[in-house]
Amino acid sequence: MLLANMRPRNQLDVLDQCSEKKYVIADTMDIWISTERNELLALMTKVDLFVINESEAKLLTETKNLIVAGKKMMELGPNNVIIKTGEHGAMLFGKGDDEFFRTGAYPLESVADPTGAGDCFVGGIAGFIASIGQNSPSFNDLKASIARGTVMAS
């Protein structure tokens, strides 16, 4: 289930209405971090994968270091965290000390319009996870999903 970027209280309502939750991915944005922080923190305890961009990660965790930010978000409840770093790719954090992955973005000569690239990225991840039929994808599965998401966002 992909809880696309909307108010965290709405994401929680959608989650509560679904009886069969196989794998839950949530996306957010800076406005919800500022205006519905408590609801967002509650949501993070109920998701398998939390996806956030670089500036949002810094805002949520009140740190400028993305490694520290990723680790702090992992302590808030999700099984995995992805920090999107735009043209620089993404970072994946897992529960184990050795569960960290950094990938670059798919290289392009020119970008016409990056609008919606983050949504395409998350959609590519969700699509890959759904295609392998795993309720609990492995860390390697998530790494593969990021590769697909990166191509989708390009």
Residue ranges and their predicted role:
Residues L15:
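Histidine-anchored nucleotide/phosphate-binding helix
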Residues R7-L12:
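Active-site-adjacent beta->alpha loops and helix N-cap segments on the catalytic face
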Residues S19-Y23, I31-R102:
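Conserved phosphate/ATP/ADP-binding segment of small-molecule kinases
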Residues M1-N5:
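Short N-terminal targeting/anchoring amphipathic segment
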Residues L66-S154:
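Conserved phosphate-binding/catalytic region of the ribokinase-like
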